[in-house]
Amino acid sequence: PYSKLFIKNLSSKTKIHSSLKIKMPKQLIFKNYSNELFREKYDLIVIALSLSGIDFIGKELKKFKIKSPILILTKGLKYEKNSKTILTLSQQLLKKNNKLNISVLKGPCLAKELARKNQTSVIVANKNIKTAKYIGKIISTKYYLIEFSKDVVGVEINSAIKNIYSMIIGSGQSLNRSSSLFQKSILEMK
């Protein structure tokens, strides 16, 4: 579910991110996936896969007792045909392993904007607010501002539907129309 060449480039001495064209911080450690990875203790495990990769990582996480907090960057919802329910990504992973300490991070946040160190605000949600704040301490900077919530499911659902509203707003013919759609979207999310 990932590019080995991409990880190799990130793991090299130069640590260049091929699509963002930036040098990554030396503190970040990038490793190819193996079962051995989850036997180690980390400050934080970050899951930044495509939506289709969540099933894969869920099956892998099921095999281990993981003590490190996990932060999901991926957005989306999954419809389960058998039970006719919609699951958030945290629910999907917890269904595989209910002992995981899962947090979610949601934007709006474009990687290129963040890489340019443009002011960005996101929210980290975990049912235990202390865990969310612990993660915030690790990842926040003067330009990357973090807010916190205990409502993991609410944050995930709003993040997923935000993209739908964004596309609708972007299709507006004028600023007045776009502003009106934006206001309506915010009211519906409350």
Kindly give the residue locations of the regions a language model identified.
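Short, charged/polar "capping" segments at the starts of alpha-helices
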Residues: 3-9, 79-82, 132
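NAD(P)-binding Rossmann-fold cofactor-contacting core
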Residues: 1-22
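Rossmann-like NAD(P)(H) cofactor-binding subdomain of soluble oxidoreductases
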Residues: 24-117, 135
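Short, basic, helix/turn surface patches
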Residues: 22-30, 174-180
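Internal alpha-helical scaffold of NAD(P)-dependent oxidoreductase catalytic cores
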Residues: 96-101, 119-190
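Cofactor-binding loop segments of dinucleotide-utilizing enzymes, especially the Rossmann-like FAD-
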Residues: 1-2, 75, 127
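A general structural signal for well-ordered alpha-helical segments in protein cores
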Residues: 7, 54, 86-90, 132, ...
